[in-house]
Amino acid sequence: MSRLSKEEISERLLELIKDETKPAIGCTEPVAVAFTVATGKKYMQGEILKIDLKVSKNILKNGKSVTIPNTEVCGLDIAGALGGICGDPEEGLFVFKNVNKDYLDKAREMIKNKVVTLNPIENTDPVFVEATLKGEKDEVIVILRRGHTNIEKVIVNGEIAFEKDNKNEKDNKDCDFMKELSLKDIREITEDISIEKLGFIMDGIEMNKEAAKEGLKRQKGLTLGSSLLKLQQEGKLGKDSATIARILTAAGSDLRMGGGMCPIMTSGGSGNQGLCVILPITVVAEDIKAPKEKLQRAVFFGHAVNNFVKKYTGKLSAICGCAIAAGIGATAGITWLLGGKDKEINGAILNMLANLTGMVCDGAKGSCAIKLSTSASEAVISAYLALNDIIVPNNTGIIGNTVEDTINNLGMLCKDGFYKADDVMLSIACKEVI
């Protein structure tokens, strides 16, 4: 374990999970763009005449095809326009909270009049937005980096109005400390942490269950969840926990990708990852009638493992983090919930990695529900397989000598092997913009 004491590690892990597990309305990439513009608007006097947006290719890929909440439209340009019209930076990940038809009409008028420009830029952090706002009196430049609401710098009329102190940037410390942990360390912290500190976990469980219910009712996104439910009602799909997890996770993603206004608890800064971590664990807990405290700890474990994996793969990457990192978190939480020890927990993770490694990210959109639903059901199945001693052998393919070695292999594959593949995918998915 780290040079820090176990108590310090536990507190730091809790702080990280709380920071990366917050409610959000809408996909967090358009949110990041709207939040950046809304922040700039706060520093301006008078009307916005021009908005120039520069975004990382990963922000572009993950934001261009997902529906903005309470609208039927997609696009980072319109997200930026809405941020300038009705965005409130104090709302954070709820920046789209005030969107309505009148504001949408104004945003469309801005796009029509070419008030907003959008360009991808190379060689920057995966999470990066720069917004230049020009008004009647002021010019404001806002830079967001490394987090969907992490404003790094604000420049007003050539003068620095705000600059974040990055010398003690806790994100970097968190990354270092997480990589010093093992899965066993995280499991031990999960079991030892005071249950009084995990109240926010139940908030996320209830929030994402409600989102799944709404997704089944409303015709949003791909409508995969309601379609799978119909197949189940017709007797073409079973009523086991893997299938139920598949249906509910798909429904939650339908709602989120389809512009629903229902808040969703994130994991690792992503709403889809929050759905994929929380819902499968919750379904299994309800199936086995697990005590509330055990469910809370299992979901906390799932969040922690998701974040652990993403310290290797990156916050936004070439692989589908929602299906792979979050799915790994879910299967770890499920296996622990079902009484699995380190051998079975690690085995379930290896089963997921042997199965889903290679699932690429081709951007946030309605069909993300398919990937999430696959991961949700496989997370349940992988856990039960590991508990029945069906575990992929070490040193075969992507699987290394230990589970930590394997996650490191995933990170190497993602950052070194898939780097060019991600560029190709970006050129395919964003060819009309790049």
Swiss-Prot record:
Designated name of the protein: UPF0597 protein CLD_2616
Coiled coil: none
One protein family per Pfam: SDH_alpha
GO biological process: L-cysteine catabolic process to pyruvate
GO molecular function, one term: L-cysteine desulfhydrase activity
Similarity comment: Belongs to the UPF0597 family.
Alphabetical list of InterPro entries matching this protein: Ser_deHydtase-like_asu (IPR005130), UPF0597 (IPR021144)
